[in-house]
A protein has these predicted regions:
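Short cytoplasmic-facing helical segments at TM-TM junctions of multi-pass membrane proteins
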Residues: 166, 170-211, 236
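C-terminal transmembrane helix and the adjacent membrane-cytosol boundary/short C-terminal tail
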Residues: 115, 207, 249-283
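Periplasmic/extracellular loop-to-transmembrane helix junction in inner-membrane transport proteins
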Residues: 18-31, 54-99
Length: 283
């Protein structure tokens, strides 16, 4: 009987892996596996970074060790040489990002709601969204000078397009089934727009918002290199020109940490705004 059973299992089309009971994962590890793997990956990166410099593969004139970078970062925050440069950059990035967020969502929703506007905006969109920001720096300087206005304008430009594109795509992609159901129940245009279109579109708009937040600091560093007396971009460039390698990488570290904090904040906001979707999709 056992032989017959074994033969039937071998002749079955069911893969052997599906016949074996899956291994039960540790509940704690299942919950924190991303954190665990993230810490391991970061540790391996730091070890590799230290080894590259310590073994002489790369001169410390070009790449400081992790410990020297962290020391320069802490010292810069303690004596104010680095801390005083972070806040002006954060202010510019936040102002530019908020302006781009308002314009991008408002115009994106408008264009996405009217099909004729989509057709009119498509060639303009294809042209401007692919222009290099560095190529446009002289244009911004020409119009706004080298003061705060040009830096904020550059950030607005870099942040606007991801938000606008995602907003247009999200609004125009709202399922007709939802719209027809709302109309069948007697909902008016304003109600459909505020209670159906916008909630359905927001989950698809948020990836553009997060990309825009990343673009804000990338564009800001380029803008600060054009001119100005303070800012994280100025700090990094000045340290580079003076061959202060640990200070240069400390500035880069500060920029990365600010980006992580901003991304974490946006993740929490997205989690709250799209909570209704998780209830429907069990995510």
């Amino acid at each position: 009987m056992a032989t017959t059973t074994d033969e039937s299992l071998r002749d079955s089309d069911i893969p052997l892996e599906d016949l074996i009971q899956p291994k039960v994962r540790n509940p704690w590890f299942a919950k924190f596996d991303r954190l665990v793997y993230g810490v391991i990956g970061l540790g391996l990166f730091l070890v590799l970074w230290w080894w590259v410099v310590a073994s002489g593969q790369v001169s410390d004139q070009y790449l400081s060790t992790p410990q020297d970078t962290v020391k320069a970062f802490v010292d810069g925050l303690s004596d104010g040489t680095l801390g005083s440069q972070i806040w002006p950059s954060v202010q510019r990035a936040v102002v530019g990002f908020v302006i781009a967020l308002i314009l991008g969502v408002a115009l994106g929703v408008l264009v996405g709601s009217v099909r004729i506007f989509q057709k009119l905006a498509e060639p303009v969109l294809l042209f401007f969204r692919n222009l290099s920001l560095l190529a446009l720096l002289p244009v911004f300087v020409l119009f706004f000078g080298i003061g705060e206005e040009s830096k904020i304008a550059i950030v607005v430009w870099a942040c606007f397009w991801p938000i606008f594109v995602n907003a247009v795509s999200a609004v125009s992609g709202v399922e007709r089934l939802l719209l027809n159901a709302a109309r069948t129940l007697g909902a008016g245009r304003f109600y459909i727009f505020t209670q159906v279109v916008l909630p359905a579109a927001f989950p698809a708009i948020f990836p553009g918002i997060r990309l825009a937040a990343a673009n804000a600091f990338t564009a800001l560093v380029a803008a600060e290199l054009v001119g100005g007396a303070e800012g994280i971009g100025i700090y990094i460039n000045t340290a580079s020109l003076r061959y202060q390698t640990p200070q240069m990488y400390a500035g880069i570290l500060a920029l990365g940490l600010v980006g992580i904090i901003v991304n974490a904040i946006l993740t929490v906001v997205e989690w709250r705004v799209t909570s209704w979707q998780r209830g429907l999709t069990s995510k």
